């Protein structure tokens, strides 16, 4: 069963629905780039027209089993335009200590993850990946992750 916190993150992070543009100088979700877990640049503009579920994850978290739910959602809805993007972070209790290679191996071996995963990033605070800073500035503090 998908837990309550997982649904909270879905509601908070599915900001691609809002793709609002307040002026020509305002960024949107699709203006960002992020490194994949393989070290390649992932240009989010390639997902225009899709619904994006951006979720921070960790391999040693009590919610690690959410990978099963994320993969199921991705499998069920990818043909309808849903893209799940997992962003590993070590900011919550040191629960993602591994390298990108270790994280990728863990996800593929234990959960058969096929949705895009990124490099490990900070998701809150001054050193957060710019997409998280943008989300906070654009949609408010409620978009700042509180846990994995």
Q: What are these regions, as identified by a protein language model?
A:
Residues 48-53:
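Local sequence-structure signature of Cys/Sec-based thiol-disulfide redox active-site neighborhoods
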Residues 63-129:
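Structural microenvironment flanking redox-active thiols in thiol-disulfide oxidoreductases
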Residues 1-8:
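Bacterial N-terminal signal peptides that target proteins for export
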Residues 22-45:
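N-terminal "domain-start" segment that seeds a small globular fold
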Residues 36, 56-60:
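Amphipathic alpha-helical repeat scaffolds
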Residues 146-148:
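A short, hydrophobic beta-strand/beta-hairpin element that forms part of a small beta-sheet core
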Residues 9-16:
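Bacterial N-terminal signal peptides
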């Amino acid at each position: 069963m998908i837990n309550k916190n997982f649904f909270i993150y879905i509601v908070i992070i599915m900001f691609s629905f809002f793709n609002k543009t307040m002026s020509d100088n305002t960024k949107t979700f699709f203006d960002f780039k992020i490194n994949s877990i393989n070290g390649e640049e992932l240009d989010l503009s390639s997902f225009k027209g899709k619904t994006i579920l951006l979720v921070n994850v960790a391999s040693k978290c009590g919610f690690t089993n959410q990978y099963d739910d994320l993969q199921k959602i991705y499998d069920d809805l990818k043909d309808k335009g849903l893209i799940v993007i997992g962003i590993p972070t070590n900011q919550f209790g040191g629960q993602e200590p591994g390298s990108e290679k270790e994280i990728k191996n863990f996800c593929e071996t234990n959960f058969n993850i096929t949705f895009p995963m990124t490099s490990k990033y900070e998701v809150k605070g001054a050193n957060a990946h710019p997409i998280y800073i943008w989300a906070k500035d654009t949609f408010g503090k409620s978009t700042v992750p509180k846990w994995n």
